[in-house]
Amino acid sequence: MIETPPLVDQYCHGVLRTELGLGTFEAQLMRSAGPPAAGTTFFDTQTGFAVRRWCPPLLGLEPHATPARYLARRRELGAAETARLLLRGSGVAAYLVDTGVPGDLTGPKELALAGDAEAFESVRLELLAEQVADTSGTVGAFLANLAEAVHHAATGAVAFTCATAFTRGDTPAVDPEPPGPGAVRGAAGRWLARRPRGGAVRDPVLLAHLLWSAVASGRPLQLHTDEADPAALTGFVRATAGFGTRLVLLGGYPHHRRTAQLAAAFPHVYADTGAALGRTGARAAAVLAELLETAPFGKVLFSSGGRQLPELHAVGALVFREALGRVLGGWAAEGSWSWRDAERVAALVAAGNARRVYRLDRDETPP
């Protein structure tokens, strides 16, 4: 039996405050372009089965309760109490919360209160630029205000996050090298001239400027890869070597082995277990084992990737803990590892690596 400390969930979002019907709840279970096909349900997925396995006991039901029974119990308890029970039952001691997604979601303080945990903010660079653009009348004011906003955010947040630079097929490739002042001014002028209020930043020059502004801050930079091949990051990874800023690659499944290879090849790169474990459910141990084939154990960080449904935070944590126990416990049981080493590595991946990388403990020194 592998004992792990309380987890640090190094990437997640807030949860919805409202009651959810069957259709709304089901829509949050999967990343999908639309509702389930006629005659099917998103509950018949690895994520759906994982929710039914792990969440009902936290709400006082038997494992594998039917969706109807589970949602009825959810309504009996109410959204706030459901979130409280699920978050507190997940064994998470600290959350790093990306506050840059739309919707009526709880912020870090509310998530901390509901989960009886610490919570820290990860600032999304795109949202920061969009907020500054909404209040800046000229290109010069925008760039000056953006620099000040990044500096101010770095004093309170534990990390920056970029969600679009390396993930979107409709976004041109971002040059890995920092853009010059003239290129940045030109890109800012074009963007400000044509964007509506609240318009998203997609310009590759501005995205590169945001990335390099974050690198200069010294805060860890979380980079989404989603389902894209992390190989697209290689140029930026090479260019940022030696700056002292840690890059944490989020997502990557089904290319998680490539993420692990980048973490092994570059001292400043770290690999995230991510929402893939919750999405793969009963196969999570196999996915985690593949990540641990190549990545140095001090470079792997747990996250749930939970968003909107507290069930996804809970499932991410509980599936991870079980998968970690199965993988490391299996290697120890067969004699490949000692039990002491297995528990030491479990503690690193579960919490220790994140606490070191993000300097969550005041006495931590930079990695």
What are these regions (language model features)?
Residues 67-70, 129-136, 269-277:
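Short, basic, glycine/proline-bearing loop/turn elements
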Residues 11, 95, 160, 271, ...:
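Divalent metal-coordination and catalytic microenvironments
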Residues 193-303, 353:
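Catalytic pocket-lining loop regions of alpha/beta-barrel enzymes
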Residues 309-313:
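Short active-site-adjacent structural elements
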Residues 24-115, 121, 143-155:
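Alpha-helical scaffold segments that flank or form the walls of functional sites
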Residues 12, 100, 225, 305-306:
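Active-site metal-binding loops of divalent metal-dependent hydrolases
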Residues 1-10, 16-61, 68-73, 297-299, ...:
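Mid-to-C-terminal alpha-helical segments outside catalytic/metal-binding sites
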